[in-house]
């Protein structure tokens, strides 16, 4: 009976090692071609490796938690293809595994909780991956239903809706989580939202300060005085990338406060537009489109520095910084410059779901040209982000909240955010950085410019 060895393949771009996270089979199990055998963690992502062999698992040569070099035998398969007269040299088997890993589509009935994609908040439930069904459609004002008078500053809140009394409660996932953290029963809350939904203010009003301290428990201090965490995998890759960027590229940062009221109105209208039914729409979508628009006007910020030359990219692979339980990752939307607003929304949604499931592949994070980090979902006003290696621009989107703002000589409450950009000063001069961020701000202030 023929025994075939499976060698750990290079599933990324020049990766040299990976950690065995979990085995999906045991010795004696029957396996088919393309059946997932093992889950590994590289310096870039978590990857499921399918078997290029058919047969019976002979021996698992590496234990979970062990880090091994590319090309190391990690398990054996007996029989199968050999019995059918099909043999495969080790090198071809390795390449087959890489090809199979790249072609496998991962689906899950429900995304794993816990992973937070910057710009989308906590992972939801009952969300399935979908493809955009109208790839060619672009957002047009005519496609929108008549907009409700948008929340004009000073407008009185909607008529309060009494507690549901056991009926369904309208509340967004972050509001439900806040209510759970504060020990507030949503069915007892009087809703003041525009369509009868429970708002953050409603929950905070219901939960008194005393209940906050009573229901949010502080973890006990561990018995051990110290904890030592081995630096490996994604954390090691993050550390190396941040050190390389911080100490090789001289960062320059600029900031601007922006009236985002019309962006909030535009997002509300998009959610009601027929073409966008079932599509995730948030201010991050407008921000992403604004970045692409501003790059076209200021192409230098979409460059890379090579010591010998500056390479200006005339395409946009738009990175979205994502915080996950495994650490920071920056997948990117390929060729974002050619996407309509609807297509970009679908691409961001796909990127979100993939990151939540921990299935972002190395290729999804390669060849980025400029990045957005949405620290606003964590309640932060702004920051000085570090450049993604190989890029010369990154923009932080701060939280969007109501603040006093002067409009036509009068102080009114408006939705305001702060944009913070970091740039590689070897490539981007201060005037270019300022013009670029001002262009981004102009779209946030008036997103209708995107439709010109």
From Swiss-Prot:
<dbReference type="InterPro" id="IPR000089">
    <property type="entry name" value="Biotin_lipoyl"/>
</dbReference>
<dbReference type="InterPro" id="IPR011053">
    <property type="entry name" value="Single_hybrid_motif"/>
</dbReference>
<dbReference type="InterPro" id="IPR004167">
    <property type="entry name" value="PSBD"/>
</dbReference>
<feature type="modified residue" description="N6-lipoyllysine">
    <location>
        <position position="44"/>
    </location>
</feature>
<feature type="domain" description="Lipoyl-binding">
    <location>
        <begin position="3"/>
        <end position="78"/>
    </location>
</feature>
<dbReference type="Pfam" id="PF02817">
    <property type="entry name" value="E3_binding"/>
</dbReference>
<keyword id="KW-0808">Transferase</keyword>
<comment type="subunit">
    <text>Forms a 24-polypeptide structural core with octahedral symmetry.</text>
</comment>
<feature type="compositionally biased region" description="Low complexity">
    <location>
        <begin position="135"/>
        <end position="153"/>
    </location>
</feature>
<dbReference type="GO" id="GO:0005737">
    <property type="term" value="C:cytoplasm"/>
</dbReference>
<keyword id="KW-0012">Acyltransferase</keyword>
<comment type="function">
    <text>The pyruvate dehydrogenase complex catalyzes the overall conversion of pyruvate to acetyl-CoA and CO(2). It contains multiple copies of three enzymatic components: pyruvate dehydrogenase (E1), dihydrolipoamide acetyltransferase (E2) and lipoamide dehydrogenase (E3).</text>
</comment>
<dbReference type="Pfam" id="PF00364">
    <property type="entry name" value="Biotin_lipoyl"/>
</dbReference>
<feature type="domain" description="Peripheral subunit-binding (PSBD)">
    <location>
        <begin position="170"/>
        <end position="207"/>
    </location>
</feature>
<dbReference type="InterPro" id="IPR023213">
    <property type="entry name" value="CAT-like_dom_sf"/>
</dbReference>
<dbReference type="InterPro" id="IPR036625">
    <property type="entry name" value="E3-bd_dom_sf"/>
</dbReference>
<feature type="active site">
    <location>
        <position position="425"/>
    </location>
</feature>
<dbReference type="InterPro" id="IPR050743">
    <property type="entry name" value="2-oxoacid_DH_E2_comp"/>
</dbReference>
<keyword id="KW-0450">Lipoyl</keyword>
<dbReference type="GO" id="GO:0004742">
    <property type="term" value="F:dihydrolipoyllysine-residue acetyltransferase activity"/>
</dbReference>
<comment type="similarity">
    <text>Belongs to the 2-oxoacid dehydrogenase family.</text>
</comment>
<protein>
    <recommendedName>
        <fullName>Dihydrolipoyllysine-residue acetyltransferase component of pyruvate dehydrogenase complex</fullName>
        <ecNumber>2.3.1.12</ecNumber>
    </recommendedName>
</protein>
<dbReference type="GO" id="GO:0031405">
    <property type="term" value="F:lipoic acid binding"/>
</dbReference>
<dbReference type="Pfam" id="PF00198">
    <property type="entry name" value="2-oxoacid_dh"/>
</dbReference>
<feature type="region of interest" description="Disordered">
    <location>
        <begin position="124"/>
        <end position="172"/>
    </location>
</feature>
<dbReference type="InterPro" id="IPR001078">
    <property type="entry name" value="2-oxoacid_DH_actylTfrase"/>
</dbReference>
């Amino acid at each position: 009976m023929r025994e075939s060895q499976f060698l750990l393949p290079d599933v990324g771009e020049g990766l040299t090692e990976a950690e065995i996270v979990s085995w999906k089979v045991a010795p004696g199990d029957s396996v088919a071609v393309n059946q997932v055998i093992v889950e590994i963690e590289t310096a870039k992502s978590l990857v499921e490796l399918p078997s290029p062999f058919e047969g019976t698992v002979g021996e698992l040569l590496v234990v979970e938690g062990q880090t091994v070099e590319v090309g190391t035998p990690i398990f054996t398969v007996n029989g199968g293809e050999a019995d059918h007269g099909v043999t495969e040299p080790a090198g071809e088997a390795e390449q087959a595994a890489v090809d199979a890993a790249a072609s496998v589509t991962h689906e899950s009935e429900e995304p794993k909780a816990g992973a937070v994609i910057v710009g989308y908040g906590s992972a939801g439930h009952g969300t399935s991956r979908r493809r955009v069904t109208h790839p060619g459609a672009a957002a047009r004002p005519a496609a929108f239903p008549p907009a409700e008078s948008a929340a004009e500053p000073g407008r009185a809140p909607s008529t309060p809706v009494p507690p549901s009394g056991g009926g369904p409660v309208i509340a967004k996932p972050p509001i439900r989580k806040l209510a759970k953290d504060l020990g507030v029963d949503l069915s007892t809350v009087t809703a003041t939202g525009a369509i009868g939904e429970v708002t953050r203010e409603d929950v905070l009003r219901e939960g008194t300060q005393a209940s906050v301290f009573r229901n949010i428990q502080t973890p006990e201090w561990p018995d051990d005085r110290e904890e030592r965490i081995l630096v490996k995998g994604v954390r090691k890759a993050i550390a190396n990338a941040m050190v390389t960027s911080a100490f090789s590229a001289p960062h320059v940062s600029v900031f601007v406060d922006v009236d985002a009221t019309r962006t909030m109105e535009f997002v509300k209208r998009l959610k009601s537009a027929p073409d966008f039914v079932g599509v995730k729409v948030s201010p991050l979508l407008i921000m992403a489109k604004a970045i692409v628009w501003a790059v076209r006007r200021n192409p230098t910020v979409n460059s890379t520095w090579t010591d010998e030359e500056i390479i200006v990219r005339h395409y946009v692979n738009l990175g979205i910084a994502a915080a996950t339980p495994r650490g920071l990752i920056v997948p990117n939307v390929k060729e974002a410059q050619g996407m309509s607003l609807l297509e970009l929304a679908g691409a961001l949604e796909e990127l979100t779901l993939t990151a939540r499931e921990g299935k972002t592949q190395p290729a999804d994070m390669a060849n980025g040209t400029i990045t957005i980090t949405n620290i606003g979902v964590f309640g932060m006003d702004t920051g000085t982000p570090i450049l993604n290696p190989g890029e010369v621009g990154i923009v932080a989107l701060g939280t969007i909240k109501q603040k006093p703002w002067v409009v036509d000589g009068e102080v009114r409450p408006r939705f305001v955010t702060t944009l913070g950009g970091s740039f590689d000063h070897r490539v981007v001069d201060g005037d270019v950085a300022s013009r670029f961020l001002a262009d981004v701000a102009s779209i946030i202030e008036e997103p209708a410019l995107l439709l010109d």
